[in-house]
Amino acid sequence: MNIDIVISADHIDEKGLINKTVIIIDILRATSVITTAINNGCKKVIPVLTVEEAKDIAKNSEEDIILGGERNALKIDGFNFSNSPLEYTKKYVEGKTVVLSTTNGTRAINNSFNAKTILISALINSKATAKAIDKLHEDLIIINSGTNGQFSIDDFICSGYLIDCLYNIRKDLELSDIAKTAHYIYTNNKDIESFVKKATHYSRLKSLNLEKDLEYCFQKDIIDVVPQYKDGYIIKSNI
């Protein structure tokens, strides 16, 4: 199995994704939100690029819609929820559709539509993601959503942890140089939050008093669910 990493949503080569399995990572916080919502019984998540698109879907849909997302880490005016995974509890999302628009994560998803399979991962479900990947027997591209088109330490070290989880299942991994680097960084910094504390995006969230979000997002493997993008929606994968 060949594994490569893309460092941000802006670095995605859409043609290069054809017939590939893609893993989208945005641990702070979009993929943590999606994984949490699906785990709490959300019917589906619709990832969109713009605020206007999200509001149009909510206006024209007959389904029970929750609008969620952020711009510059802040809740969007007129939306039900921000990009905090702690808001997407079973009480509020069970049986409902979440329309999500974020600065980085939903853009990475929308830029990956050429892929054969798109799975959603974060620290909170990395082991479950690794098990699903193992069943697919396909080359893998891990896409880090990044921060405003730039490299993001938090997504990168999460990629390293996901690779480590895969190594615990199978040994026939062929890593690109960047994938080797991510794995090396993780294996030498297994206390991920401590390593990430000086990162730009981490500091931004902390400045907004989102310490509880950070604490939640840096937990490993508290969820055994893998969301999958399919036919316009993100649902619970049956892989």
Swiss-Prot record:
Catalytic activity: (2R)-O-phospho-3-sulfolactate + H2O = (2R)-3-sulfolactate + phosphate
Cofactor: Mg(2+)
InterPro entries attached to this UniProt entry: ComB-like (IPR005238), ComB-like_sf (IPR036702)
Key words, A-Z: Hydrolase, Magnesium
Gene Ontology MF term list: 2-phosphosulfolactate phosphatase activity; magnesium ion binding; sulfopyruvate decarboxylase activity
Gene3D superfamilies xrefs: ComB-like (3.90.1560.10)
One Pfam family in the UniProt entry: 2-ph_phosp
Its EC number(s): 3.1.3.71
SUPFAM superfamilies: ComB-like
NCBIfam families attached to this UniProt entry: PRK00886.1-1, PRK00886.1-4
Family per record: Belongs to the ComB family.
Protein's UniProt name: Probable 2-phosphosulfolactate phosphatase
Upper classification of the organism: Bacteria, Bacillati, Bacillota, Clostridia, Eubacteriales
